[in-house]
């Protein structure tokens, strides 16, 4: 079967999937959890082979250390978290059939705005084998079919998880064709041309990957090109709080797209706060790329100077995805906001301040999908937002923004329920009817639709 035929098959499977009850969709998720638990050792063994090959590539400079970290399924509780993510998605309310607007246009002529699936998704990702399970669970719950294209570095993990999904769906009412998995690099360019069948592309990977996809398809693309997050320490910030937040934002998981890459610090607290913050960071082996003002404060500190170096302009436009942080001194809140809006990636940015007025100004003025006050940027995550898991993070200014859960994979359709009315009966003049446009109580409809 050709690639186009596979995609067409997935589109046909979507037409079945979108009509299944939430009970049938949830049952498929249960089957995936069962298979993940049964085949855990198989999947981790395959992942270990990918890791072995990836480490060799990293040693030869052909693969970044951050990519290797993203690939590892055995670290910490990553596998169990992946399984729990499926259960969390299952526990969420059905995102389909929700009425968000209702009007009675006339007696017996009622209009409803109802949530529905997007259609056939194409998700292209690098490393991160858990994305297969994350996306599959969200797609099934939201009634979408999906074509998944993984990176070559996760080939064996991809194959093992593909077997899990295929086996699970074979025991459910969700068509196996609703989740298609492809690996050949050559197939990406072909997939990007299939706008007749594919409704939305969601890239998860490097800036270059996202830009390449946006430049080479007519299909709408949802995602973010970079995760260049910043923290700003305001003039009234508590030093201990700032140290704690900056440390977590940079070191909790440096390879994550919600880790901070730039620290902005108000000149009023440069001498009082930066030494403590820098000491905390360098104890965690973070290299600090400093502007002249911050460099002057830190260069003679024995505990930190070995990991301090002058910054260059490009550092403030770089997603390091590593234990590296660019530091810049700013004279005011307005200057901090201007820097972030100029150099940031519209992902997630944070202000550390005791002033609600300053925080509100920052959150209103920063052009990002997430703006935080006294909280780590690492919270920008679908699981932490209560979405179960996420399909990705969008910095687009369209229907979905920020961490995307089920809502990001639904759109809406208008349902008009009548009993034979014709448009020519309405208008101005003799014998014409006027529209009533009477609001219908949405709460009552929502309760009925959930039964």
Swiss-Prot record:
It is an enzyme of class 1 (oxidoreductase). Its EC number is 1.2.1.41. Gene3D superfamilies: Aldehyde Dehydrogenase, Chain A, domain 1, Aldehyde Dehydrogenase, Chain A, domain 2. GO terms for molecular function: glutamate-5-semialdehyde dehydrogenase activity; NADP binding. InterPro entries: Ald_DH/histidinol_DH (IPR016161), Ald_DH_C (IPR016163), Ald_DH_N (IPR016162), Aldehyde_DH_dom (IPR015590), G-glutamylP_reductase_CS (IPR020593), Glu-5-SA_DH (IPR012134), GPR_dom (IPR000965). It comes from the Eukaryota. Keywords: Amino-acid biosynthesis, NADP, Oxidoreductase, Proline biosynthesis. Pfam families: Aldedh. Pathway: Amino-acid biosynthesis; L-proline biosynthesis; L-glutamate 5-semialdehyde from L-glutamate: step 2/2. The keyword Oxidoreductase applies. The keyword Oxidoreductase applies. SUPFAM superfamilies: ALDH-like. GO terms for cellular component: cytosol; nucleus. Catalyzes the NADPH dependent reduction of L-gamma-glutamyl 5-phosphate into L-glutamate 5-semialdehyde and phosphate. The product spontaneously undergoes cyclization to form 1-pyrroline-5-carboxylate. HAMAP family: ProA (MF_00412). Belongs to the gamma-glutamyl phosphate reductase family. This is Probable gamma-glutamyl phosphate reductase. It comes from Schizosaccharomyces pombe (strain 972 / ATCC 24843). The lineage of its organism: Eukaryota, Fungi, Dikarya, Ascomycota, Taphrinomycotina. The gene is pro1.
């Amino acid at each position: 079967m050709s690639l186009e035929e596979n995609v067409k098959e997935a589109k046909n499977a979507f037409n079945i999937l979108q009509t299944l009850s939430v009970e049938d969709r949830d049952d498929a998720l249960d089957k995936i959890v069962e298979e993940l638990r049964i085949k855990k050792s198989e999947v981790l063994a395959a992942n270990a082979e990918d890791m072995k090959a990836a480490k060799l590539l990293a040693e030869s400079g052909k693969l970044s250390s951050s990519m290797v970290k993203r690939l590892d399924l055995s670290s910490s509780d990553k596998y169990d978290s992946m399984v729990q993510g499926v259960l969390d998605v299952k526990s969420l309310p059905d995102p389909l059939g929700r009425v968000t607007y209702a009007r009675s246009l006339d007696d017996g002529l009622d209009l409803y705005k109802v949530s529905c699936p997007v259609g056939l998704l194409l998700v292209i990702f690098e490393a991160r084998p858990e994305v297969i399970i994350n996306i599959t669970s969200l797609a099934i719950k939201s009634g979408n079919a999906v074509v998944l294209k993984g990176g070559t570095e996760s080939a064996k993990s991809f194959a093992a998880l593909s077997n899990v999904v295929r086996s699970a769906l074979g025991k459910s009412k969700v068509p196996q064709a609703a989740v298609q998995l492809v690996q050949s690099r050559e197939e990406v360019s072909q997939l990007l041309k299939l706008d007749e069948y594919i409704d939305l592309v969601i890239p998860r990977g490097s800036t270059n990957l996202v830009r390449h996809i946006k430049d080479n398809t007519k299909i709408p693309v949802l995602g973010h090109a970079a995760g260049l997050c910043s923290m700003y320490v305001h003039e009234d910030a508590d030093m201990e709080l700032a140290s704690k937040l900056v440390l977590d934002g940079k070191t909790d998981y440096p390879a994550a797209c919600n880790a901070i890459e730039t620290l902005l610090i108000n000149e009023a607290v440069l001498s009082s706060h930066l030494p403590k913050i820098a000491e905390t960071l360098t104890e965690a082996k973070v290299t600090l790329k400093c502007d002249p003002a911050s460099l002057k404060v830190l260069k003679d500190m024995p505990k930190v100077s070995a990991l301090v170096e002058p910054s260059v302009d490009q550092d403030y436009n770089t997603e390091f995805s590593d234990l590296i942080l660019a530091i810049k001194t700013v004279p005011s809140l307005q200057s901090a906001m201007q820097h972030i809006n100029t150099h940031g990636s519209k992902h997630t940015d944070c202000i550390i301040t005791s002033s609600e007025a300053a925080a509100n100004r920052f959150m209103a003025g920063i052009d990002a999908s997430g703006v935080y006050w006294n909280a780590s940027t690492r919270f920008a995550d679908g699981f932490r937002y209560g979405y179960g898991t996420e399909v990705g993070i969008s910095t687009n200014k369209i229907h979905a923004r920020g961490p995307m859960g089920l809502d990001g994979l639904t759109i809406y359709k208008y349902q008009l329920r009548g009993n034979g009315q014709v448009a020519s009966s309405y208008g101005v003049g003799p014998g014409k009817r006027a529209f009533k446009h009477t609001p219908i109580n949405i709460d009552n409809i929502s309760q009925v639709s959930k039964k």
